[in-house]
Amino acid sequence: MPTPSMEDYIEQIYILIEEKGYARVSDIAEALSVHPSSVTKMVQKLDKDEYLVYEKYRGLVLTPKGRKIGQRLVYRHELLEQFLRLIGVSEENIYRDVEGIEHHLSWNAIDRIGDLVQYFQEDERRLEALRDVQKRNEQGE
């Protein structure tokens, strides 16, 4: 299993490849706000661990293993954003909150959060009931 730091890189590489068709060290560095030399070190480690294939000055390609994990990491991130919006977390806090929790939840917990999001999406009245509870709690403060 990749470390949380490795996950951040794999996720970002996956996103860049999906958006642009490629991911360069400079693009990854800019997206993650890190120095290119840090990206090079991590990319070499990810290559060694067979998440991607890296050729200096030629770029990188995710392996099937790296693509699968990248896809799952993007799903996790998007699901957590969706969940936090659903429960009423303010938009300006969502990205930071997701970044703070995403590496600490098991995949079982992620799957259960997915179930909960689906539960609320299947019947608008459930979401309205949640909003009513939140409104009552805010008035009680």
Swiss-Prot record:
Q: Indicate yes or no for the key word Transcription.
A: yes
Annotated localization = Cytoplasm
How is the protein's activity regulated, according to its record? DNA binding is strongly activated by Mn(2+).
Occurrences of domain HTH dtxR-type (ranges): 1-63
Question: Which InterPro entries is this protein grouped with?
Answer: DtxR_MntR_Metal-Reg, Fe_dep_repressor, Fe_dep_repressor_sf, HTH_DTXR, HTH_tscrpt_reg_MntR, Iron_dep_repressor, WH-like_DNA-bd_sf, WH_DNA-bd_sf
Please verify whether the record's keywords include Nucleus.
no
Q: List the disulfide bonds.
A: none
User: Matching PROSITE patterns, A to Z?
Assistant: HTH_DTXR
Q: Which GO terms describe its molecular function?
A: DNA binding; DNA-binding transcription factor activity; manganese ion binding; protein dimerization activity
- Which keywords, in A-to-Z order, does the entry hold? Activator, Cytoplasm, DNA-binding, Manganese, Metal-binding, Repressor, Transcription, Transcription regulation
Predominant location: cytoplasm
Return one Gene Ontology term, BP aspect.
intracellular manganese ion homeostasis
Give residues annotated as binding Mn(2+) 1: D8, E99, E102, H103
Query: Which Pfam families would you find in this protein's record?
Result: Fe_dep_repr_C, Fe_dep_repress
Sites binding Mn(2+) 2 sit at: E11, H77, E99, E102
One GO cellular component this record assigns the protein to is: cytoplasm
* Family of this protein: Belongs to the DtxR/MntR family.
The record's note on quaternary structure and interaction partners says: Homodimer.
Q: What does this protein do?
A: Central regulator of manganese homeostasis.
Name of the featured protein: HTH-type transcriptional regulator MntR
Q: What is the lineage of its organism?
A: Bacteria, Bacillati, Bacillota, Bacilli, Bacillales
